Amino acid sequence: MATQQPTQTDNSAQAQPPQTNPAKPTEISEPGIYVALTHDHLNYQSVIDRVRSPEAGAIVVFAGTTRNNFNSLPVQHLSYTSYAPLALRTMLTICRSILTKHGLKGIAMVHRLGVVPIGEESILIAVSSPHRQAAWRAGEEALEECKAKVEVWKREEFGGEGGGVWRANRDGAVGVKVDEPRIGKGEVDEKEDEGDSGNGGNDRKS
């Protein structure tokens, strides 16, 4: 009987976060819940309308925006990527749990992908509830759960010689610096195939 050879793991191929297709925005909706990933600008009104209910006495909206610095370093912009099928399932699971736990009438969670300039929104979360206290608590919990669990990565692009750093969404961990050698296009393509960029630890989205 032939002995099966162990498969060699290519660690370099795991270095980059998985990519999403900009041409295919993705979303999932069910009664009281809406989750989406998109490369478009985020629209407050459309997210609020997703959670409107005649039984709700309060709607709370959280907007995460790109700030112009991180640890005193100037940030030019953020760039987000995601493994969309898994991220959407995680977002849906979070929203289902929070909807039930807090007795909400609606919850919507939309995350932007691609480049997000300074001052623009990278995430919108809206919740509606009969009472404001539950809405406040649910909105905060939804944000923290999203940051801790959803499969979205960001790259911070620093000014000057700072370069770029990949980070995931969890607070407190260190990202991985992206080194981009000044070489020809053909060599760049080859390096990308080898996984030249790193997938960071975990840190803030916004």
UniProtKB/Swiss-Prot annotation:
Q: Which GO terms describe its molecular function?
A: molybdopterin synthase activity
Under the heading SUPFAM superfamilies, the entry gives: Molybdopterin synthase subunit MoaE
Secretion signal span: none
Known function: Catalytic subunit of the molybdopterin synthase complex, a complex that catalyzes the conversion of precursor Z into molybdopterin. Acts by mediating the incorporation of 2 sulfur atoms from thiocarboxylated MOCS2A into precursor Z to generate a dithiolene group.
Gene behind the chain: nit-8
Task: Tell me a GO cellular component.
Answer: molybdopterin synthase complex
The pathway entry for this protein reads as:
Cofactor biosynthesis; molybdopterin biosynthesis
> What are the Basic and acidic residues biased-composition ranges?
177-188
**Enzyme class of the recorded protein, top EC level:** transferase
Q: Which reaction does it catalyse?
A: 2 [molybdopterin-synthase sulfur-carrier protein]-C-terminal-Gly-aminoethanethioate + cyclic pyranopterin phosphate + H2O = molybdopterin + 2 [molybdopterin-synthase sulfur-carrier protein]-C-terminal Gly-Gly + 2 H(+)
InterPro entries, from UniProt? MoaE_sf, MOCS2B_euk, Mopterin_biosynth_MoaE
Q: Where is the composition biased (Gly residues)?
A: 197-206
Q: Where in the cell is it found?
A: Cytoplasm
List, as start-end ranges, the regions of compositional bias called Polar residues.
Answer: 1-23
Q: How does it assemble?
A: Heterotetramer; composed of 2 small (MOCS2A) and 2 large (MOCS2B) subunits.
Please give the positions of the paired cysteines in each disulfide bond. none
- Chief place of localization: cytoplasm
User: What is the organism of origin for this protein?
Assistant: Neurospora crassa (strain ATCC 24698 / 74-OR23-1A / CBS 708.71 / DSM 1257 / FGSC 987)
* This protein's name: Molybdopterin synthase catalytic subunit
Cite the binding residues for substrate. 131-132, 147, 154-156
Provide this UniProt record's keywords sorted from A to Z: Cytoplasm, Molybdenum cofactor biosynthesis, Transferase
Q: Which family does it belong to?
A: Belongs to the MoaE family. MOCS2B subfamily.
